[in-house]
A protein has these predicted regions:
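Bacterial N-terminal signal peptides that target proteins for export
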Residues: 1-9
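Bacterial N-terminal signal peptides
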Residues: 8-16
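Intrinsic disorder/low-complexity segments
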Residues: 13, 21-22
Length: 336
């Protein structure tokens, strides 16, 4: 068994007289891929929003001179809801200011939580429901009542996160591993959710997959393809992109406030439909995402600085049971 380096998660409030600490981070490498990640930390962490899972925000992944992930925004502002355009800048709010392939879980226990009570976001913790909240808002920062017990173990080519939380009637152990596959330009994101309580866990999760390939704006030469004929009741702006059978093809460079977004329907419950290819002939690189669970739904969203294909899966975990899922990312170059 390999010995990992245990990294303490700093959840206590530090002395105000100390200088601001840099966000804790880690680096993993398999000689083909190099990835850099921010670590979960309630005080000094890079991401402190209450929308996305805190376990391992990948802010850089390099392969053959290409970089796949990085900030899609120029700066952040705690007063922004989602993001805005401010002159030439894209300004992200605290819940959206994140990078790379990040997971967002649907909240647990929101409806039954009383004002001031607690609800759950897996990968974040038990959050406080405001007194004036009518419905859940994933762009709002909620107070964290209990972050749970976190641990991180780092190896040369992988990093393991775990969070145990007992709150709001739920008790679970969540694990996530970012693993670079030996001898291959591939990264696996391996997840498990074990129900340690007496209440069933019913939720869903998707990966936002913020892709900023070499920081080129989406445009002609960029395609998204899947194994099924894409159907959409809200197709993209026909001047910017179009659906062609199983592909979405970009027709013009996204600029200013351009948006290409569409639901991607037409898949079946076969696991083989959970596969995505994104290729850009302008930069000569691409990636394939393949998962081992059937799709619940899928959508595409892109602006001038980023493209994101968002696959959802359903999660149902009975008391005492464990649910696992894995997504494999393959990175490659294209022959020009």
């Amino acid at each position: 068994m390999r010995k990992g380096i245990s990294i303490p998660i700093l959840l206590a409030v530090s002395l105000s007289l100390l200088p601001a600490a840099a966000p804790p981070q880690a680096e993993i490498d398999n000689s083909l891929l190099n990835a850099k990640l921010y670590l979960p930390d309630a005080k000094h962490g890079y991401y402190q929003g209450t929308r996305f899972d805190w376990s391992g925000v990948i802010y850089s992944l390099e392969f053959e001179g290409h970089n796949y992930y990085g900030p899609w925004f120029n700066r952040t502002d705690p007063n922004i809801h989602d993001f805005i355009y401010d002159g030439p800048d894209i300004v992200a709010g605290p819940c959206s200011a994140v990078t790379g392939p990040v997971d967002e879980f649907a909240p647990l226990g929101w409806d039954e939580a009383k004002p001031g009570g607690e609800f759950i976001k897996v990968g974040i913790g038990a959050l406080r429901k405001p007194a004036d909240a009518a419905k859940y808002d994933n762009y709002k920062v909620y107070a964290i009542a209990d972050p749970g017990k976190w641990s991180v173990k780092k190896y040369r080519d992988s990093i393991e996160f775990s969070q145990e939380l007992s709150a709001a009637g739920y008790h679970f152990l969540y694990r996530k591993t970012a693993r670079l596959i030996p001898g291959k330009p591939e990264m696996a994101l391996e997840h498990s959710l074990k129900n340690l309580g007496t209440r069933a866990i019913q939720t869903n999760v998707y990966n936002h997959n913020f892709l900023t390939l070499d920081h080129h704006p989406p445009g002609p030469g960029l395609t998204v393809s899947v194994p099924f004929q894409i159907q959409s009741n809200h197709p993209p702006n026909k001047k910017l992109a179009e659906i062609r059978a199983n592909r979405i093809v970009y027709l013009d460079i996204l600029k200013d406030r351009d948006v290409v977004a569409t639901p991607m329907e037409g898949f079946t419950n076969k696991v083989g439909n959970h596969l995505i290819r994104i290729e850009d002939t302008r930069v000569g690189a691409g990636m394939k995402i393949q998962a081992d669970r059937p799709l619940l739904r899928e959508s595409l969203w892109s602006i001038r600085s980023v493209i994101a294909v968002e696959p959802f899966i359903e999660i149902n975990v009975a008391p005492g049971a464990e649910f696992t899922w894995k997504s494999t990312y393959e990175y490659y170059t294209l022959t020009r």
